[in-house]
A protein has these predicted regions:
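Alpha-helical segment proximal to the catalytic Tyr-Lys
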Residues: 132, 174-178, 238
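Conserved glycine-rich Rossmann-like NAD(P)H-binding loop of the short-chain dehydrogenase/reductase
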Residues: 29-44
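Substrate-binding pocket helix/loop in short-chain dehydrogenase/reductase
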Residues: 89, 103-104, 108-116, 210
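Active-site loop-to-helix junction immediately N-terminal to the catalytic Tyr of the SDR YXXXK motif
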Residues: 107, 147, 151-159, 171, ...
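Conserved glycine-rich cofactor-binding loop
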Residues: 13-15
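Short C-terminal tail/terminal secondary-structure segment
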Residues: 150, 230, 241-253
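Active-site helix of classical SDR
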Residues: 127, 161, 169
Length: 253
């Protein structure tokens, strides 16, 4: 019998995904994390997780290309057997994504299709193909955005994909509940990362404005999100499913 539960975190080599992976490891879980192109960054996260006393593996995954998902899960199955001595993992965190800031009237079909593939089609079919390896009683954690609740010009396409993920979350929870699989979605507000070119982190004017519009008086930090996701990967969250959990500090109330 394996000692630790296992979480698979997409986009776990940097930004919020890295923080999620480390926060999950601090809860005593082992981690499979994915990266798109930055293998060296992913390997460093693996080392940090191992330093916490947990096992970790980094695998390449392009979430935009669903034709590669079947091969990816063959690699996951091999890693589960070789590194973790099991054939199942417990939690899937659909974190990988990009942001495109473009006015509705100027968004191109190529930009729209890119967002669909990465932010909706990818997580939809990745979750579907994960099911044979996802243990009963486990969970799926999807990632949304505060922009699905409030509107900021330039994010029509991005926020629409996240709105679709919020609807999908409820259907997944309904259809997978018979297996004890919980499905929730976490919606971060403005966070200081390199997302969107680091605008929230590096632009003092933007940072100050967003802080002034937040009940808790500041913008978010990666630690504010990683801990929420990690909590959902524990038995303490066993009675929580089909929920949208916004972690924004109370933006635009």
């Amino acid at each position: 019998m394996r000692q630790s539960k296992i979480a698979l975190v997409t986009g776990g080599s940097r930004g919020l995904g890295k923080n999620m992976a480390l926060a999950i490891a601090k809860k005593g879980l082992d981690v499979v994390l994915t990266y798109n192109s930055q293998k060296s960054e992913a390997d460093e996260v693996v080392k940090e997780i191992e330093a916490l006393g947990q096992k970790a593996v980094a695998l390449q995954l392009n979430v935009a290309d669903s034709t590669g998902f079947e091969g990816f899960f063959k690699a996951v199955g091999a890693a589960l057997s070789e590194t973790f001595s099991t054939d199942k993992f417990d939690y899937l965190v659909n974190n990988a994504g990009i942001g495109i800031h473009k006015a509705f009237a100027e968004t191109t079909t190529d930009e729209f299709d890119t967002l669909v593939n990465i932010q909706f089609k990818g997580p939809f079919f990745l979750s579907q193909l994960a099911l044979p390896l996802l243990a009963d009683g486990g969970g799926i954690i999807n990632i949304s955005t505060g922009l699905a609740r409030f509107s900021t010009p330039g994010y029509a396409a991005y926020a629409s994909m996240k709105g679709a993920m919020e609807t999908l979350t409820k259907y997944q929870a309904k259809e997978l509940g018979a297996k004890g699989i919980r499905v929730n979605i976490v919606a971060p507000g403005a966070i200081e990362t390199d997302f969107g070119g680091g605008m929230v982190r590096d632009n003092e004017q933007v940072n100050n404005f967003l802080a002034s519009q937040t009940a808790l008086g500041r913008v978010g930090l990666p630690d504010d999100i990683g801990g929420v996701v990690a909590f959902l990967c524990t038995d303490d969250a066993r009675w929580i499913t089909a929920q949208r959990i916004e972690a924004s500090g109370g933006m635009f109330l």
